[in-house]
Amino acid sequence: MVPKLFTSQICLLLLLGLMGVEGSLHARPPQFTKAQWFAIQHINVNPPRCTIAMRVINNYQRRCKNQNTFLRTTFAYTANVCRNERIRCPRNRTLHNCHRSRYRVPLLHCDLINPGAQNISTCRYADRPGRRFYVVACESRDPRDSPRYPVVPVHLDTTI
């Protein structure tokens, strides 16, 4: 049986709609600049256990984020990494605005262990501490960002 064109178009629209919803779930809350949202998601000098640390992110996103990495360093240190040599981003090879840290930093990687959680208050995470290099994508600052840093980290691409 061959699907009719109309049915195929409806299915395609539904699929694209679902992909759009999934994409919007990962979107930055509009009240934050890219750098501010990066700091909320990835900078925490002394993060508590993952289940507690992830509550802030999950409250903004209204969902249980599958995984996240907290760099146990300062925003200033991470912004200075943006001065390092520019490289192609390892995870997103189409981007050429990444920079690798020169030193390993302590970090805390969080993995969601109950992906079927119906409520963000019940999200539970496994903690994986470590010490690694990291790669960030950087961009010129938004006018709402501090003028102290002309180029700011906006995306944690990977840890090495």
Curated annotation (Swiss-Prot):
<dbReference type="GO" id="GO:0002227">
    <property type="term" value="P:innate immune response in mucosa"/>
</dbReference>
<protein>
    <recommendedName>
        <fullName>Eosinophil cationic protein</fullName>
        <ecNumber>3.1.27.-</ecNumber>
    </recommendedName>
</protein>
<feature type="glycosylation site" description="N-linked (GlcNAc...) asparagine">
    <location>
        <position position="119"/>
    </location>
</feature>
<dbReference type="Pfam" id="PF00074">
    <property type="entry name" value="RnaseA"/>
</dbReference>
<dbReference type="GO" id="GO:0004519">
    <property type="term" value="F:endonuclease activity"/>
</dbReference>
<feature type="disulfide bond">
    <location>
        <begin position="89"/>
        <end position="98"/>
    </location>
</feature>
<comment type="similarity">
    <text>Belongs to the pancreatic ribonuclease family.</text>
</comment>
<keyword id="KW-0325">Glycoprotein</keyword>
<dbReference type="InterPro" id="IPR001427">
    <property type="entry name" value="RNaseA"/>
</dbReference>
<feature type="signal peptide">
    <location>
        <begin position="1"/>
        <end position="27"/>
    </location>
</feature>
<feature type="disulfide bond">
    <location>
        <begin position="50"/>
        <end position="110"/>
    </location>
</feature>
<keyword id="KW-0540">Nuclease</keyword>
<dbReference type="GO" id="GO:0004540">
    <property type="term" value="F:RNA nuclease activity"/>
</dbReference>
<feature type="active site" description="Proton donor">
    <location>
        <position position="155"/>
    </location>
</feature>
<feature type="region of interest" description="Required for nearly all of the bactericidal activities; partially involved in LPS-binding">
    <location>
        <begin position="28"/>
        <end position="72"/>
    </location>
</feature>
<keyword id="KW-1015">Disulfide bond</keyword>
<feature type="modified residue" description="3'-nitrotyrosine">
    <location>
        <position position="60"/>
    </location>
</feature>
<dbReference type="GO" id="GO:0050830">
    <property type="term" value="P:defense response to Gram-positive bacterium"/>
</dbReference>
<comment type="function">
    <text>Cytotoxin and helminthotoxin with low-efficiency ribonuclease activity. Possesses a wide variety of biological activities. Exhibits antibacterial activity.</text>
</comment>
<keyword id="KW-0378">Hydrolase</keyword>
<keyword id="KW-0732">Signal</keyword>
<dbReference type="InterPro" id="IPR023411">
    <property type="entry name" value="RNaseA_AS"/>
</dbReference>
<keyword id="KW-0964">Secreted</keyword>
<comment type="subunit">
    <text>Interacts with bacterial lipopolysaccharide (LPS) and lipoteichoic acid (LTA). In vitro interacts with phospholipid bilayers.</text>
</comment>
<feature type="disulfide bond">
    <location>
        <begin position="64"/>
        <end position="123"/>
    </location>
</feature>
<feature type="glycosylation site" description="N-linked (GlcNAc...) asparagine">
    <location>
        <position position="92"/>
    </location>
</feature>
<feature type="active site" description="Proton acceptor">
    <location>
        <position position="42"/>
    </location>
</feature>
<dbReference type="InterPro" id="IPR023412">
    <property type="entry name" value="RNaseA_domain"/>
</dbReference>
<dbReference type="GO" id="GO:0006935">
    <property type="term" value="P:chemotaxis"/>
</dbReference>
<keyword id="KW-0944">Nitration</keyword>
<keyword id="KW-0255">Endonuclease</keyword>
<dbReference type="GO" id="GO:0003676">
    <property type="term" value="F:nucleic acid binding"/>
</dbReference>
<dbReference type="GO" id="GO:0005615">
    <property type="term" value="C:extracellular space"/>
</dbReference>
<feature type="binding site">
    <location>
        <begin position="65"/>
        <end position="69"/>
    </location>
    <ligand>
        <name>substrate</name>
    </ligand>
</feature>
<feature type="disulfide bond">
    <location>
        <begin position="82"/>
        <end position="138"/>
    </location>
</feature>
<dbReference type="InterPro" id="IPR036816">
    <property type="entry name" value="RNaseA-like_dom_sf"/>
</dbReference>
